[in-house]
Structures are given as C-alpha cells and as structure tokens.
C-alpha cells in the first residue's frame, strides 16, 4: 500500500497539468446536514486545524482539498522556484498561485476571507469552489470535497430556495461516477432520517461508492449506544459504517490538538465499543478511504488509459501537422510542392488519402458534370425549339429565289439545321466553366484535408493557390476555343450522307410512303369518276393522256381562266404551283424520298384542265401585283404540310446526330485541354514559379503563433505520455 502512495501522487500531479475537465480522478465527497460534523471529519483526516469551525452554517463554498503524502526525511519543500520553505507540512491555494502557507491558522483565515469575498459575510452560499492542497507526511493521498450542509430554512442573505440550491450543488459533485460519497450522520439522530444517505442513494442506488460515517458517538443519550447502527443492523451500507468521535466546541476553544483528540477517541472506542474499536475511528476511516480510492482507480484504469491514448494520438497528430523546425528549406519547399501536386492529381483520379463522404468532389464531380449535368442539359434542348411552321415555309420560299420550286431546296434544310445546332454551343461552354470551377475547389480541398503542413506556411499556401489558379485561368480560353471549334466544325459541313442520317431518312421514307398510300386510297377513286364525267364522245383524248395544246386553245375562256388561276395561286402563297398538284418533295434527296407511280397518276389526273364557265363580272376583283405579300392565317395545303413535315423530320434526325457528337466530343476536349494538361504540367509549373532561392526565406516563414502552439502541443503530449507510464506502473504492482 505504501508503495502506491508516490505513484498515485504522481498520477494526480500529471493530471493536474492536463486539467480536471479532461481526466477526472476519483475523489471523496463529504455530504451531510448542517452541523453534522463534516468539517471535523476532514480535519481529523488531515490531522490539522485548518477549516473554519463554529455554529450554524460555516462551510458556504465547496472546498476541494487534496492531501499529498510526503516523506519524513524530505524537510526542505520547494515549488520549483528559488524560494522554498523549511516545514514538514504546508498548504497552497489555487487562487493565490505559488504562495505557501505553513501556519494553518493562516490557511483557515484565508478560507474565511475567500469565502466572504465571493459569498458575502451574511451566511450567503456560492457554488464556486476553493482549491486547497495540503502537503504532509501524516496523510495518505486523498482528494476530498467539503460541501455546504443541507438546510431547510433560509437565514441571513440566503435566498428562499436555498434548500434547492444546496441540493443541486451536492448532486453536481456526487453525480460524478468516479467519486466516492462520504455520507456523514450524527449518532444522536435517527439513522432512518439521514438526509445524507437519502441523497446518496439517488445517484448511487446500489451503494457501490457510498461510505457511511457516524459522528458524535460520545453525545448519545445515557443508556444508549450505536452498536446496532455500526453493525449495519438498522440500515446496511455496502461499503460499511464507521464511527468517529469529533472534538467538541469546548475542546476547540481550549486548543485541543487533533493528535490528542485521536488518542482520546481511541480510548473512548476501547471503553464503549471494545469489539468494534479496530474497525472504527479516524485512522481506520483514513485507511478505508485510501483502500476504496485505490480500488476505484483500478476499476477506472481501462477507461482512463483509453482516454489518455485518444488524447495522446490527437496531440501527436497535431504536433505532426505543425512539423519540426525547418533546417533544409530547399528540400522542405520541394517536398511540399511535390506533395501538393500529387494530392491534387490523386483527388482528380479518386485515389486521394482523404476522401470526402458528404459530397462529390474532384474527379467524381467532373464525371457527374460530364454525364449528368451536361448530358441532361443537351437532352433537354428541343431539336425544333424556336421553329414554327411559318419559319420553315419562309425559309423554303426564300431559298428558291424568283423561281418556282419543283422540290424542297436543300439550302433551306441547311439554314434551319445550322440555326438549331448553334444552340448547342452555350451548354457546351457552360460545361467547361463548371469543370473549371470544380478544379478551383480541388485546390481548397487539398489545402484543408490533404496537405495540412501548408498551414504552417501561409505565404507558401497563398503562392501555391495563386500559381494553380493562374494555370487554370490560362487553360480556360484554350478549352473554350476548342469547344467553340467543335460546334463550328458541325456548322461548317452538313453531311447529308452520314450513315445514321441516311437510315433515318429511310425510316422516314417508309412512314411517308405509308401515309401516301392511305391518302391515295381515298383520293384515286374520286379522280377517276371525275375524269369519266368530263369526257366528250370524240373531241377529247383518253383520260390517261395529257390534253394537247390545240385542245387547250379551243377551250372557251381558257387563257383568261389560266391567268386568273395563276394570279390566285400567287396571292395564296402556293409557290407558283397549283394547290392540287402533288409535286415530289425530294429536292436533293431523290434517292431517299421517292414518289410512287400511283401518286404520279393522281398528279396527271389533277393536272388536266377542267372546263370552267367564264367568270362573272360581278364576282371578279382587282389584284395589285405591286403589294408586298403578307402572311395570311389560313389552312396549309397538302403540299405545304408535307414540306414542313419533311423539313422537321430531317432537322430532328440530323440534330440528334450532331448532339450525340457534341455530347461525346466536348468532355474529351475538356479532359485533354484542361484537366489532363493541368495534371501533367502542375508540378513543373509550381517548381518553375516557386522553387527559387530568392523566395525560400519568404515562402517558408511560419505564422507568428506556430512556435507557441508547437510547444504547447509537445508539453501536453509529454504529460499524457507520463500519465500513461504511471498507469502502466500501477498495473504492474502486486495489488492488482
């Protein structure tokens, strides 16, 4: 047991440097009602008169008292400074820094002064603790907490809810699972009414860390004793019940020493409780508390060891990120540049050490831009967006010039499809911009997660960011130009012989043929019946032949009628061809879109002159040929509908081919001219711009507080390693 005292003391000192909030050691918390003898028990354990005593409420602030065992031979006690003190026992307050107290009357007075400074001088209570450490060869290594006694009625400056405030204060200390509760109860009160045991059971229902102390054994009524209570027959306590005899107020007034009090206590126990004398008393209480503390520490060692290891790993990682002081600046600069370039490329490739889990980044995000954002944007572009029937008809008529069109002009198709292809340029350039932005974000990602060493050198970090940003900025116009050229290439030559386009035209031809057959099935019988009704016995030719010029000249009013029909056709926008004539619409696609024989027969039938009576003067109207034709809302003729349908299908077919090409070629161009180029030239660009002897000192200048943070991390790591070593020593002792 004695061998463990210096080890436990070292452990306590080490964790005092770490901080009690980081690692909480087991401590003894004294609770009880007001004037039950809590402070007297503490004084007996310390062996000195150091706590304020009196009637009523005396302890008005929590007192954290740490007892530190020192050897008898060590007469000169120092604090690590030049000044020391020649004494066997001394105390030190946390709020007075390094000031030492050898007179325990001064310690008691300082406690009173510090209490009044915070709590006032009229029985006020404060939750702010007083920290006191006592060094003595007469104590074992214990940490004790003296708390204000529980009360019911407020007095002096105490608030109305003083009972609730003190209760919450006590619960805050005893709720710590690493604490041992010392429940103090006066022997001259009923054990069943003990407030200390009641509040202890609230946080420790199993009684695994509660020790009962019975005070004032010498003040019981004549003829009674505490034998049943001390034996645990009234209320059993798992850790035991220990009786003690405190000094009375008369003994204190007479300056009776603690040593004399302990001697008289032993004599009293031998006389009144001879069978229990060796298991009661202040000395036995001290040994029991020490044993409980040791076992409690043993139970907490695994958790303490784990927490120390976690903290040590954190501070080791932090210290590594701070790095060692730079000796070879040239090698350090080259190493940092190379590491950044490698991490940047690895982030793009997806092999980086630190992989983001909350969102896509690096190469994965670039892939998403190519195949999701850019792909969906292109697919959302309507092949016929911005075109209507009037636009198509106008383009067809403008492409024919002054000549009537026999076929749909190919130039009208090219004009319209180029207009649609041009719409693919804007989303393509936007794709380049998104990839450029993502490569900018990769710079920050590498700085924050991958190469934390750069945080040591803020100027180097800024310089690297500037060089990479400039490199990306230089590649942006080149990439945009290439993407622009890809669209321009598609606009430069409309390849109507493209295999996919020919296949589409073949499918379209089959569809149109089917529609024509359906239309012919409806119109051919009516044309034949009309031909039979218009025959003259011997004057007209067969219906299958065209009328001769002589026959046309003989028809009454034919010239006037033809002129009127032409005029009417021009005014109605028929393109110089009669509405009823079904002309082939192949233009330069004759081999793709063919006219059936049946349709040619129907065209011949419709081209035959139909005798018409001379126009009535009252129904005629004048036509001004100098007027500019204006669009007229009307129903499209069959030919116009067919021409628009053909152009729309051809535009859609060719647009889909071009869109597929753009969707495939733009990501390739971006990868070659931007992404891969930056990957290949990044390190050489960084070395060329930054690896210069004139820039070494400036770039490798650490931030002002880096040295201080490195020292603090090293000190904390050393303290944690010392604590880990002490725990290992405790485990190796025979006690465990």
Swiss-Prot record:
Q: Please give the residue positions where the record annotates the modification Phosphoserine.
A: 529, 548, 607, 616, 637
Q: What is the effect of changing residue 192 to E?
A: In OPA5; changed localization to mitochondrion; impaired mitochondrial membrane fission
Q: Specify the protein name.
A: Dynamin-1-like protein
Using the UniProt annotation, give all residue ranges assigned to the region (G2 motif). Answer: 58-60
Q: Which gene encodes it?
A: DNM1L
Which residues does the record give as GTP binding sites? 32-40, 215-221, 246-249
List the PANTHER family hit by this protein, alphabetically.
Answer: DYNAMIN, DYNAMIN-1-LIKE PROTEIN
Its record classes its membrane topology as: Peripheral membrane protein
Q: Which residues are glycosylated?
A: 585-586
Provide the reaction this enzyme catalyses.
GTP + H2O = GDP + phosphate + H(+)
User: Any idea where this protein resides?
Assistant: Cytoplasm, Cytosol; Golgi apparatus; Endomembrane system; Mitochondrion outer membrane
Question: List-wise, which residues carry S-nitrosocysteine?
Answer: 644
Q: Quote the annotated effect of residue 41 to F.
A: Temperature-sensitive. Impairs mitochondrial division
Q: What is the effect of changing residue 345 to A?
A: No effect on S-nitrosylation
> Which stretches does the entry tag as region Middle domain?
344-489
What are the residue boundaries of the GED domain, all occurrences included? 644-735
GO CC annotation, single? endoplasmic reticulum membrane
Q: Outcome of residue 644 to A?
A: Abolishes S-nitrosylation. Reduced dimerization and no enhancement of GTPase activity
Q: What is the effect of changing residue 149 to A?
A: Abolishes GTP hydrolysis
């Amino acid at each position: 047991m004695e061998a463990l005292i210096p080890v436990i003391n070292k452990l306590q000192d080490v964790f005092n440097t770490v901080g009690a909030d980081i690692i909480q050691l087991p401590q003894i918390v004294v609770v009880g009602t007001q004037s039950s003898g809590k402070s007297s028990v503490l004084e007996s354990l310390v062996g000195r008169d150091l706590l304020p005593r009196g009637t009523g409420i005396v302890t008005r602030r929590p007192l954290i008292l740490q007892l530190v065992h020192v050897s008898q031979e060590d007469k000169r006690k120092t604090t690590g400074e030049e000044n020391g003190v020649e004494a066997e026992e001394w105390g030190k307050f946390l709020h007075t820094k390094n000031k030492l107290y050898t007179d325990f009357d001064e310690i008691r007075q300082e406690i009173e002064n510090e209490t009044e400074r915070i709590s006032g001088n009229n029985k006020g209570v404060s939750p702010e603790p007083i920290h006191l450490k006592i060094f003595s060869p007469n104590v074992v290594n214990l940490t004790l907490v003296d708390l204000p006694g529980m009360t019911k009625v407020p007095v002096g400056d105490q608030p109305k809810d003083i009972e609730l405030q003190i209760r919450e204060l006590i619960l805050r200390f005893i709720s710590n699972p690493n604490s041992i509760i010392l429940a103090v109860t006066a022997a001259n009160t009923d054990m069943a009414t003990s407030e200390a045991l009641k509040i202890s059971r609230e946080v420790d229902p199993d009684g695994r860390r509660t020790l009962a102390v019975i005070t004032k054994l010498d003040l019981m009524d004549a003829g009674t004793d505490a034998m049943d209570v001390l034996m645990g027959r009234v209320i059993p306590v798992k850790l035991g019940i220990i009786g003690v005899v405190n000094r009375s107020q008369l003994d204190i007034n007479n300056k009776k020493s603690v040593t004399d009090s302990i001697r008289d206590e032993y004599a009293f126990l031998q006389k009144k409780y001879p069978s229990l004398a060796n298991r009661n008393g202040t000395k036995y209480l001290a040994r029991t508390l020490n044993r409980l503390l040791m076992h409690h520490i043993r139970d907490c060692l695994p958790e303490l060891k784990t927490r120390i290891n976690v903290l040590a790993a954190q501070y080791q990682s932090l210290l590594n990120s701070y790095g060692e002081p730079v000796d070879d600046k040239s090698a350090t600069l080259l190493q940092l540049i190379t590491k950044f370039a490698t991490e940047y490329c690895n982030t793009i490739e997806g092999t980086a050490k630190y992989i983001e889990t909350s969102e896509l980044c690096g190469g994965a995000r670039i892939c998403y831009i190519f195949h999701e954002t850019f792909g969906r944007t292109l697919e959302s572009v309507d092949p016929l967006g911005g075109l209507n029937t009037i636009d198509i008809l106008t383009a067809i008529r403008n492409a024919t010039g002054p000549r009537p069109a026999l076929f749909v002009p190919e130039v009208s198709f090219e004009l319209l499809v180029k207009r649609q292809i041009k719409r693919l340029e804007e989303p393509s350039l936007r794709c380049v911009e998104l990839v450029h932005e993502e490569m900018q974000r990769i710079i920050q990602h590498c700085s924050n997660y991958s190469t934390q060493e750069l945080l040591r050198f803020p100027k180097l970090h800024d310089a690297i960011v500037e060089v990479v940003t400039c490199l990306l900025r230089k590649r942006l116009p080149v990439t945009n130009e290439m993407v622009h050229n890809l669209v321009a290439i598609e606009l430069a030559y409309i390849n109507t012989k493209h295999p996919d386009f020919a296949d589409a035209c073949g499918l379209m031809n089959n569809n149109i043929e089917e529609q024509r057959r359906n239309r012919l099935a409806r119109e051919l019988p009516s044309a034949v019946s009309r031909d039979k009704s218009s025959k003259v016995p011997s004057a007209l030719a067969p219906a299958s032949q065209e009328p001769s010029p002589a026959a046309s000249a003989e028809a009454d009013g034919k010239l006037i009628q033809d002129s009127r029909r032409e005029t009417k056709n021009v005014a109605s926008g028929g393109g110089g061809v009669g509405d009823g004539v079904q002309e082939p619409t192949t233009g330069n696609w004759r081999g793709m879109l063919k006219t059936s024989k049946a349709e040619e027969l129907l065209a011949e039938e419709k081209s035959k002159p139909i005798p018409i009576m001379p126009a009535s003067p009252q129904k005629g109207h004048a036509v001004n040929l100098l007027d500019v034709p204006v669009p007229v809302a009307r129903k499209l003729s069959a030919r116009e509908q067919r021409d628009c349908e053909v152009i729309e299908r051809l535009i859609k077919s060719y647009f889909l081919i071009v869109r597929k090409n753009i969707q495939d070629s733009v990501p390739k161009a971006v990868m070659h001219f931007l992404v891969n180029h930056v990957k290949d030239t990044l390190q050489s660009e960084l070395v060329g711009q930054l690896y210069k002897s004139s820039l070494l000192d400036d770039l490798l200048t650490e931030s002002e507080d880096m040295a201080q943070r490195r020292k603090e991390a090293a000190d904390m790591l050393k303290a944690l390693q010392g604590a880990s070593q002490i725990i290992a020593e405790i485990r190796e002792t025979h006690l465990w």
